[in-house]
């Protein structure tokens, strides 16, 4: 029984020598439906690494299943440290096109999921900030209302007492001053009146 062979020169054959390539996963095995001439014309798709992980799995464990169902070979290279990966699709041209469409549809689907997740997170942040602002405004209004009530209570309790005390003091002072001012005049008038009466009275002679 023949041992399945690999393609040790696949990356060297299809990639420029100057391009730094990090191979992710193993080189594909040869299947009965795969012909060596398919290595000459690969289709290339470039995606973010996180999308490649979503589509094929973190360890590329879904690649064998896709290869068997689509009768193509898939090889993934990481081209740069910024998170971009290159997917090489080998096989019949029609199968290559179908596989690339499937990959791009899955990539769009995962992008939409991420956008929805980001939108929900943003909406939650906005709602939290609005709640904090409303809570702060409510606390400020309540504090202001309480202070206004305290001020009104202090004013209501203090003002009548002070007014009554002030009025009483003013009345007593006015009465004292009035009595003091009128007493000498009244006394003088009384003395003068009595003196006049005594003068007008007839003198009884013996």
Curated annotation (Swiss-Prot):
<dbReference type="GO" id="GO:0106333">
    <property type="term" value="C:subcortical maternal complex"/>
</dbReference>
<feature type="modified residue" description="Phosphothreonine">
    <location>
        <position position="145"/>
    </location>
</feature>
<keyword id="KW-0539">Nucleus</keyword>
<protein>
    <recommendedName>
        <fullName>KH domain-containing protein 3</fullName>
    </recommendedName>
</protein>
<comment type="subunit">
    <text>Component of the subcortical maternal complex (SCMC), at least composed of NLRP5, KHDC3L, OOEP, and TLE6. Within the complex, interacts with NLRP5, KHDC3L and TLE6. The SCMC may facilitate translocation of its components between the nuclear and cytoplasmic compartments. Forms a scaffold complex with OOEP/FLOPED, and interacts with BLM and TRIM25 at DNA replication forks. Interacts with PARP1; the interaction is increased following the formation of DNA double-strand breaks. Interacts with NUMA1.</text>
</comment>
<keyword id="KW-0597">Phosphoprotein</keyword>
<dbReference type="GO" id="GO:0003723">
    <property type="term" value="F:RNA binding"/>
</dbReference>
<dbReference type="GO" id="GO:0140095">
    <property type="term" value="C:cytoplasmic lattice"/>
</dbReference>
<dbReference type="GO" id="GO:0140089">
    <property type="term" value="P:protein storage"/>
</dbReference>
<feature type="compositionally biased region" description="Polar residues">
    <location>
        <begin position="166"/>
        <end position="183"/>
    </location>
</feature>
<keyword id="KW-0496">Mitochondrion</keyword>
<feature type="modified residue" description="Phosphoserine">
    <location>
        <position position="171"/>
    </location>
</feature>
<dbReference type="GO" id="GO:0005694">
    <property type="term" value="C:chromosome"/>
</dbReference>
<feature type="region of interest" description="Disordered">
    <location>
        <begin position="144"/>
        <end position="206"/>
    </location>
</feature>
<keyword id="KW-0158">Chromosome</keyword>
<dbReference type="GO" id="GO:0005739">
    <property type="term" value="C:mitochondrion"/>
</dbReference>
<dbReference type="Pfam" id="PF16005">
    <property type="entry name" value="MOEP19"/>
</dbReference>
<dbReference type="GO" id="GO:0140094">
    <property type="term" value="F:structural constituent of cytoplasmic lattice"/>
</dbReference>
<dbReference type="GO" id="GO:0005813">
    <property type="term" value="C:centrosome"/>
</dbReference>
<dbReference type="InterPro" id="IPR036612">
    <property type="entry name" value="KH_dom_type_1_sf"/>
</dbReference>
<comment type="function">
    <text>Component of the subcortical maternal complex (SCMC), a multiprotein complex that plays a key role in early embryonic development. The SCMC complex is a structural constituent of cytoplasmic lattices, which consist in fibrous structures found in the cytoplasm of oocytes and preimplantation embryos. They are required to store maternal proteins critical for embryonic development, such as proteins that control epigenetic reprogramming of the preimplantation embryo, and prevent their degradation or activation.</text>
</comment>
<dbReference type="GO" id="GO:0050769">
    <property type="term" value="P:positive regulation of neurogenesis"/>
</dbReference>
<dbReference type="InterPro" id="IPR031952">
    <property type="entry name" value="MOEP19_KH-like"/>
</dbReference>
<dbReference type="GO" id="GO:1900006">
    <property type="term" value="P:positive regulation of dendrite development"/>
</dbReference>
<dbReference type="GO" id="GO:1905168">
    <property type="term" value="P:positive regulation of double-strand break repair via homologous recombination"/>
</dbReference>
<dbReference type="GO" id="GO:0032991">
    <property type="term" value="C:protein-containing complex"/>
</dbReference>
<dbReference type="GO" id="GO:0005938">
    <property type="term" value="C:cell cortex"/>
</dbReference>
<comment type="similarity">
    <text>Belongs to the KHDC1 family.</text>
</comment>
<feature type="domain" description="KH; atypical">
    <location>
        <begin position="40"/>
        <end position="103"/>
    </location>
</feature>
<dbReference type="InterPro" id="IPR051778">
    <property type="entry name" value="KHDC1"/>
</dbReference>
<keyword id="KW-0206">Cytoskeleton</keyword>
<dbReference type="GO" id="GO:0005634">
    <property type="term" value="C:nucleus"/>
</dbReference>
<feature type="region of interest" description="Involved in RNA binding">
    <location>
        <begin position="1"/>
        <end position="40"/>
    </location>
</feature>
<feature type="compositionally biased region" description="Basic and acidic residues">
    <location>
        <begin position="144"/>
        <end position="153"/>
    </location>
</feature>
<dbReference type="GO" id="GO:2000781">
    <property type="term" value="P:positive regulation of double-strand break repair"/>
</dbReference>
<dbReference type="GO" id="GO:0032880">
    <property type="term" value="P:regulation of protein localization"/>
</dbReference>
<keyword id="KW-0963">Cytoplasm</keyword>
